[in-house]
């Protein structure tokens, strides 16, 4: 069974590309035709590419890896946050701050500041500090949460990046490529597919299209996690069986010893 159907893609408007005058020739192999000055994406290829991306992301998840979702354009912000949280992953849905991947040591200090301000409030310091200072601290906290809240629990580099619109997220892609982190991306007809390891040719401007495809990547992660959970359960069951076997053997030995002594 296919990961995604042609009907789902059509209903979400995934097939609508950009105007023919705004295109990247490298996307030619993913274009089906042109209609009223708009390129139409070949959805048969999209179905295949979604499946390839899905299987890759699922494997990353099965291996215990994490995926960083990146989508800072308005059409992607809500879906990126919601689907990343649903799958228990990291996300950046506001401005990409330079160094999130390549200078994480500095970024992590700013993330630490979030916890520091939270502790100040928990300890009651906000009640004794001057009102003006408290207002400034709250502004600082809101700003940090806005830009770094989605990666505050990211203690190490992600094993994959999922991006919506490579043109918009070129800084994130540059950092990921520098660190050899595989990239999955929703790539429209005006983008360069060569920058992406797992290309999903699709409309990156329609909210429904972005939501559908981002949701599929979250589904892949959850399916991969289910595989990990099943393996853990099986391992625990094997341990229980081994312990049960050892206990049974011990009981048998005791019974034999008792019989022999009698």
UniProtKB/Swiss-Prot annotation:
Membrane-spanning parts: none
Keyword check for Nucleotide-binding: no
BP GO annotations: translation
Record carries keyword Zinc: no
The organism's place on the tree of life at top rank: Bacteria
Keywords from the UniProt entry: Ribonucleoprotein, Ribosomal protein
Region (Disordered): 228-262
A Gene Ontology cellular-component term: cytosolic small ribosomal subunit
PROSITE patterns for the chain: RIBOSOMAL_S2_1 (PS00962), RIBOSOMAL_S2_2 (PS00963)
GO MF, one annotated term: structural constituent of ribosome
Entries under PANTHER family matching the protein: 30S RIBOSOMAL PROTEIN S2 PROKARYOTIC AND ORGANELLAR, SMALL RIBOSOMAL SUBUNIT PROTEIN US2M
Family that this chain belongs to: Belongs to the universal ribosomal protein uS2 family.
Name assigned to this protein: Small ribosomal subunit protein uS2
UniProt source species: Staphylococcus saprophyticus subsp. saprophyticus (strain ATCC 15305 / DSM 20229 / NCIMB 8711 / NCTC 7292 / S-41)
Organism taxonomic ancestry: Bacteria, Bacillati, Bacillota, Bacilli, Bacillales
Protein encoded by which gene: rpsB
